[in-house]
Amino acid sequence: MSQPSPVSVVFAAQSVAGQVRTHNEDALACRPDLGLWALADGMGGHARGEVASALALEELVGALQQGEELFAAVHAAHLAIAAAAQPVAGEAGMGSTLVAVRLNGDEFELAWVGDSRAYRIGSEHIEQLSHDHSWVQAMVDVGRMSAEEAREHPRRNVILQCLGQVGQ
């Protein structure tokens, strides 16, 4: 029986604040040794979003290095942010979105929380793999709003889930 050929991965990563904000709360992890590529976006407007996104990836990578599965590693990141926000006044409410892909040969696992997205880019098309945990996406899902309306809606940046949010 022949073994599947290893998948060659070529990647590049860049994170910019954009044209609206002057401060970037993103963190990136590109770890081919773990088969992991991840982005965490600290909660803009919340206390210490850059701390939350960095902590999310630190915990995610650490858990995977210890042999945890991706889902368990994401949960560890969530708990770490929730715990870090508790003892320090002014940090309550800090949180982060997360999108992570883990490759194993020619298969992959995908995890996400919030509205950071994962796409599969092929030679013929681009396919969104994740599904936003956002207020506007929930409205689209139940037919109360079109995707076009969601792109312009004043609540388009309201997310329903994030790492560090108590009660998830």
PLM region descriptions:
Residues M1-Q168:
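PP2C/PPM-type serine/threonine phosphatase catalytic domain
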